């Protein structure tokens, strides 16, 4: 077990429950799994819109699959690196990170994220991973003021981008649009980091680090002209979670697209098979030469076998890499794919992006969600003490009276909505068909 500070919680707990012998991370996993924020993932878009088909993944089923892959990666690393067993704490830790990793993503996927980022452009921005950190540490009502009150190591593990918005944001942003219908996502990419509103909590998470480790951990890549800066480092646990997420995205979202007929065997062979036939790795060359036949087979068991083969291939190609510049073991070691498998995974991710995410039908759904979120924000911002639900009004007034960022309260409220709830609320506010008989929605 690593140093005890990583097991600490911001709020000291003295819960004496009968015969409760769970580890700190088993408790964290339970809190995430039983949270309202986690349950809402069942009705949030992964890639394909909720309701398009009964087969596809939602963010909840995606998170469950990421958790399974993450524990598989952990098991592989323990076998490959037995000398580093003390690094690998409870399996529940990795499960916790994987289950929680998407918990802050707003309705309508990337469209909702860009919409909230634009509406928050003068108020600290918005980004799904930053919102995840915010939900876990403050918004989810497991405690009064400390969110789920998770262990410090768990919070370190969800920090995919350990940096503050203000230190990463490129100041010379695009000109504001004259009409929100004209907003282009490419012009308003979210800053990937922690909101400045949550700086004190970030400081608490990093408190056990020595100064040199903290300074290095917060370093950024040099930004291209006109681009936001990107963070450089993440913890060991976070690196496992991120790899599991990437594998699930590339492989399972591919499966959804195949089943729904969005991609074709011809596209696969021309874009993937032709690219990977020159791989330096023999397993990649041999498997990808024929695996497309199974993926696009009319026999479902063959497709499932191919999906399992791909996941296994990537999981077993992961090892530990060491950065000697760090003293803290949780930062010194990261999980990483072999270079050839990393390239192969990138080919799959780009295939999904090119033929699925960029497909006009998918982009139309994303655009529709983008407009829904921006119009909801405009409405609530125009008269928050009239339109926000009672409890959210109280939070808004409290922030306003304390001179805090009250716009963040509106972003918190909208980002917590499911796709269906946001669409229904939008209808209640803007659809003339509903007249004056508006069904009062239960607050999230």
From Swiss-Prot:
Annotated region (Disordered), positions in chain: 1-26
For this protein, what is any one GO molecular function term?
dGTPase activity
PROSITE patterns from the UniProt entry: HD (PS51831)
The organism's superkingdom is given as Bacteria
Q: Does the record bear Aminoacyl-tRNA synthetase in its keywords? A: no
**CDD domains assigned to the protein according to its UniProt record, in alphabetical order:** HDc
InterPro entries, alphabetized = dGTPase (IPR006261), dGTPase-like (IPR050135), dNTPase_2 (IPR023023), HD/PDEase_dom (IPR003607), HD_domain (IPR006674), PHydrolase_assoc_dom (IPR026875)
Statement: the UniProt record of this protein carries the keyword Hydrolase = yes
HD domain location is: 59-250
**Mind telling me which Pfam families this protein's record contains?**
HD, HD_assoc
Tell me a GO biological process for this protein.
Answer: dGTP catabolic process
Which terms are listed as keywords in the entry?
Hydrolase
Q: Which family does it belong to?
A: Belongs to the dGTPase family. Type 2 subfamily.
Q: Which PANTHER family does the UniProt entry name for this protein?
A: DEOXYGUANOSINETRIPHOSPHATE TRIPHOSPHOHYDROLASE-LIKE PROTEIN 2, DEOXYNUCLEOSIDE TRIPHOSPHATE TRIPHOSPHOHYDROLASE
Output this protein's name: Deoxyguanosinetriphosphate triphosphohydrolase-like protein
Taxonomic classification, please? Bacteria, Pseudomonadati, Pseudomonadota, Gammaproteobacteria, Alteromonadales
